[in-house]
From Swiss-Prot:
Functional description taken from the UniProt entry: Catalyzes the reversible isomerization-deamination of glucosamine 6-phosphate (GlcN6P) to form fructose 6-phosphate (Fru6P) and ammonium ion.
Entry similarity comment: Belongs to the glucosamine/galactosamine-6-phosphate isomerase family. NagB subfamily.
Taxonomic path: Bacteria, Bacillati, Bacillota, Bacilli, Bacillales
Database matches in SUPFAM superfamilies: NagB/RpiA/CoA transferase-like
Pathway: Amino-sugar metabolism; N-acetylneuraminate degradation; D-fructose 6-phosphate from N-acetylneuraminate: step 5/5
GO molecular function, one term: glucosamine-6-phosphate deaminase activity
Name of the protein: Glucosamine-6-phosphate deaminase
Gene Ontology terms describing biological process: carbohydrate metabolic process; glucosamine catabolic process; N-acetylglucosamine catabolic process; N-acetylneuraminate catabolic process
Active site: 67, 137, 139, 144
InterPro entries: Glc/Gal-6P_isomerase, Glucosamine6P_isomerase, NagB/RpiA_transferase-like
Length: 242
């Protein structure tokens, strides 16, 4: 497990955007595993700028997002469909819509949707890079503490701490979805390379536990100890207090 310290979120986001660009230049049919949330808000605009500046053809690039809220239509302002299109997909015309994969959280049969998404992941292949954030309680994706390390894509109940953390994006806490369709920990671990980003004081304890604690299901991110190619990128706020 490699630890990379970059001064702040901007420099870290630039670094990740460049890593993604290098991958696609080397492998035009790359598979990207993408995350959402506040951690990634600078990564995708910078990545988009680099794609445009380098005139990269994205027609054969596949993307898989980690998760989507249950109950939100794709067009909802706080859906992860909207997030990804606003920050990335709408800015580069060569993205192939058929190759953009995000779970559907608004369908009637959510269990069927979870199975469909997991099967699609397995059929298309291992992500070359999987981006991750980390929750204050150590969750990755929406895999909350206690999630089985063998878990695959499924419907998950969000914890109170996750709902509270996500409430900043909604008008009222009652509007925050209580469930999501999320890739499982086993799904995530199939990626060839994993890059986890964490910024700010609120994420310091989770990173400290990840780096110094045991591998067990009470800290979902600790499964990353078992992966051969993980890079954890942190800012000075975290690194200087580890």
């Amino acid at each position: 497990m490699k630890i990379t310290n970059l001064v702040d979120k901007k420099l870290a986001s630039d670094y990740v955007a460049i890593e993604l660009l290098k991958l696609i230049k080397d492998k035009p049919d790359a598979i990207l595993g993408l995350a959402t949330g506040g951690t990634m808000t600078d990564v995708y605009p910078r990545f988009s700028e680099l794609l445009s500046a380098n005139h990269v053809d994205l027609a054969n690039v596949q993307t898989f997002n980690l998760d989507e809220y249950v109950g939100l239509e794709p067009e909802h302002a706080q859906s992860y469909h909207t997030y990804m299109h606003q920050l990335l997909f709408d800015h580069n015309a060569s993205w192939n819509a058929d190759n953009i994969h995000i779970p559907q959280g608004h369908v009637d049969d959510l269990e069927r949707e979870a199975r469909r998404y997991e099967n699609q992941l397995k059929q298309i292949g291992q992500p070359d890079i999987q981006l991750l954030g980390i929750g204050e309680n150590g969750h990755i994706g929406f895999n909350e503490p206690g999630t089985s390390f063998e878990s695959e894509t499924r419907v998950v109940d969000l914890t109170e701490s996750t709902i509270n953390a996500n409430s900043v994006h909604f008008d009222h806490i009652d509007d925050v979805p209580k469930q999501a369709v999320s890739m499982g920990l086993n799904s995530i671990m199939r990626a060839k390379r994993i890059i986890l980003l964490a910024f700010g004081e609120r994420k310091r304890d989770a990173i400290h536990q990840l780096l110094n604690g045991e591998t067990n299901e009470s800290l979902p991110a600790s499964i990353l100890h078992q992966h051969p190619n993980v890079e954890i990128i942190v800012d000075d706020t975290i690194f200087n207090r580890l």
